[in-house]
Design a protein with these regions (language model features):
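Alpha-helical transmembrane segments of multi-pass membrane proteins
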Residues: 39-40, 84-103, 154-161, 180-206, ...
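An intracellular "coupling" helix at the cytosolic face of ABC transporter transmembrane type-1 domains
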Residues: 31-32, 123-124, 140-149, 153, ...
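Helix-loop junctions and hydrophobic alpha-helical segments within the transmembrane domains
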Residues: 114, 118, 227, 328, ...
Length: 596
């Protein structure tokens, strides 16, 4: 099923300056490491800059200009250069190791913040955003930030030093020649900025498309059972091939843009060398510069061009890093629509009184109200069942209690407290949920049960499993409670997964229970055992059950029938049958079977 991508890179693009400012706080955390890295960069730059001066001195001395060339001078200059190379080696080691590690730390910090923000986003975001896209943003996109964080300050710092120093030294040799050479730089900058923009756009498109491709792969691999059951391998192959082709086309366009960028740079390189050959050669002919100065001049120009070329080569890495920061910023800019109010206080465990006061709800992307002016009192310890046709709002009503979604209007109170004014953590700690679609995490049976109570003892975990009727089958597994359940519990049957999910709630032991037909996947024997355990657990606790089999709720304190008009009927099983209304018709359709 297609999903819309919230805050997709195609929606809005921040400028480079804004993105850099967004990134600076992460870089500032490691400013000591950064400054030392830049100091090492300055040392390596010094070593590069000294060589042309040494060669100029030797050449001029050999030509009889200035000092006389002797073996002692050569040895002293060689010794100086040797010492500089030792310093350069030590500085380069720091830059290559500690500098990169700084980048890794920054990437880790950004990924932590992105994941923390994702945990705060509500169901609407995940309903409308593909998991593959999210995965790409917090993994692949941030990989490039490591290189960006290290090389961006370093490369531009080195380039600035080399360009300024080269300009000063070249001007001392020949101002007109230097101005002629540097006249090429502004034009080169204008062309580079233009082509860089095209390059960045291509990289942004690649990131979007790789997210789409990841989502396609994820759907196909996770749905392998369905794919094989319907012999739909060809359809899945075609879906993948389509996404793969689109990614290939976008990447091809990116390389065209990169080729244009690199070619323009080489053309400007050649133009600068041409200026040196013409102007420098003529200066030699007319005696305006010495041969040594010409050698030094050529070496400094070579250094300058190498610096510019390095910046050009870094442009791809720079754009990848900027794209990663941009997509990171888009996650962080996604608003948290459901969070703690400034005056939020913890919800203390209470009797479990729940009150709906004129509650209406509509999904953000659909203006049709699912619930309209619902008012409802659920007494502490009451067992309430919700029945009705699909789309009637049963699940939505239950999802509003733990604030998976925010009410459009009205309010919900638990023990007299508006749930919007209590902390989310405390609210959800007081509610136990067994969903129809069970999700088990990759790990052991014990770890999945302990999810209901972090830090639970082994004895508590085993007792929860016993109450859920899961102990017998768990002990029969190869490693018992330490058995690895596989990704999403793939190694367990549906009934086994359901019982582990129920065990979580037993361990959590909350005052309010929400059950989405918690026993529907169990065999008859287990259903009886778990049903008895649920009865015991529900005693004295407020319990809401979304019922699909009417036979399971005959003894409930109250049954609500929900329809498009809201709550259409309310009463006990016998009272509703006596009314001979909607519930009566549902009961007589398929008595004892799945009716809804």
């Amino acid at each position: 099923m297609s999903k819309t991508k919230i805050n997709d890179p195609g929606a809005h693009h921040a400028g480079s300056g804004a993105l850099i400012r967004r990134f600076l706080p992460y870089l500032a955390k490691y400013k000591k490491t950064l400054f030392l890295d830049l100091f090492c960069a300055a040392l390596t730059t010094l070593c590069d800059i000294v060589l042309p001066k040494i060669m100029s001195t030797i050449t001029n001395a050999a030509m009889g200009v200035g000092i006389t060339l002797t073996a002692g001078i050569v040895l002293r200059l060689a010794a100086l250069y040797f010492v500089l190379r030792i310093i350069d080696g030590a500085a380069s080691y720091y830059m290559s190791s500690i500098g990169h590690i700084m980048g890794v730390h920054i990437e880790t910090d950004m990924r932590r913040d992105a994941f923390d923000h994702l945990l705060k986003l509500d169901h609407t975001y995940y309903n409308n955003t593909k998991v593959g896209t999210i995965m790409g943003r917090i993994t692949n996109d941030l990989f490039d930030v490591t290189e960006f964080a290290h090389h961006c300050p370093e490369e531009f710092f080195i380039a600035a030093i080399k360009i300024v120093v080269s300009f000063v030294i070249l001007c001392r040799a020949s101002v007109p020649l230097t101005l002629a050479v540097f006249a090429c730089v502004p034009l080169m900058g204008v062309v580079s900025v233009y082509l860089n923009g095209r390059l960045r756009a291509r990289f942004r498109q690649q990131r979007v498309q790789i997210g789409e491709l990841n989502s396609t792969i994820e759907d196909s691999l996770l749905g392998q059972g369905v794919v094989k059951a319907f012999a739909a391998e060809d359809e899945e192959r075609e879906k993948f091939a389509k996404g793969n082709r689109e990614f290939e086309e976008i990447k091809t366009l990116g390389y065209y843009a990169m080729g244009a960028f690199n070619t323009s740079t080489r053309l400007f390189d050649g133009l600068m060398y041409l200026v040196v050959i013409l102007a420098g050669g003529l200066s030699l002919v007319y005696g305006r510069i010495t041969a040594g100065d010409m050698v030094a001049y050529m070496l400094y120009v070579t250094t300058l061009i190498a610096t510019i070329r390095r910046i050009v080569e870094f442009a791809e890495q720079f754009q990848r890093g900027m794209t990663g920061i941009e997509r990171f910023a888009e996650i962080m800019d996604t608003p948290v629509t459901i969070g703690d109010a400034p005056d939020a206080v913890p919800l203390q465990p209470g009797p479990g009184d729940i009150r709906f006061e004129n509650v209406s709800f509509e999904y953000p992307d659909d203006h049709n109200k699912v619930l309209h002016n619902v008012s409802l009192d659920i007494r502490p310890g009451e067992r309430l069942a919700l029945v009705g046709p699909s789309g009637g709002g049963k699940t939505t009503l239950c999802n509003l209690i733990p604030r998976f979604y925010e009410v459009t209007s009205g309010r919900i109170l638990i023990d007299g407290q508006d749930i919007r004014h209590v902390t989310l953590k405390s609210l959800r700690q007081n509610i136990g949920i067994v969903q129809q679609d069970v999700y088990l995490f990759s790990g052991t049976v014990a770890q999945n049960i302990a999810y209901g109570k972090p830090g639970a003892t082994r004895e508590e975990i085993m007792e929860a499993a016993r109450l859920a009727g899961a102990e017998k089958f768990i002990l029969a597994l190869k490693d018992g409670f330490d058995t690895y359940v596989g990704e999403r519990g793939v190694k367990l049957s549906g009934g086994q997964k359901q019982r582990i999910a129920i065990a979580r709630v037993f361990l959590k032991n909350p005052p309010i229970l929400i059950l989405d037909e918690a026993t529907s996947a169990l065999d008859n024997e287990s259903e009886i055992l778990v049903g008895q355990s649920l009865e015991k657990l529900a005693h004295g606790r407020t319990t809401l059950t979304i019922a699909h089999r009417l036979t399971t709720i005959k003894d409930y304190d109250r049954i609500l029938v929900l329809g498009e008009e809201g709550i259409v009927e309310s009463g006990t099983h016998d009272q509703l049958l006596a009314k001979q209304g909607v519930y009566y018709r549902l009961w007589n359709q398929l008595p004892g079977e799945d009716t809804l």
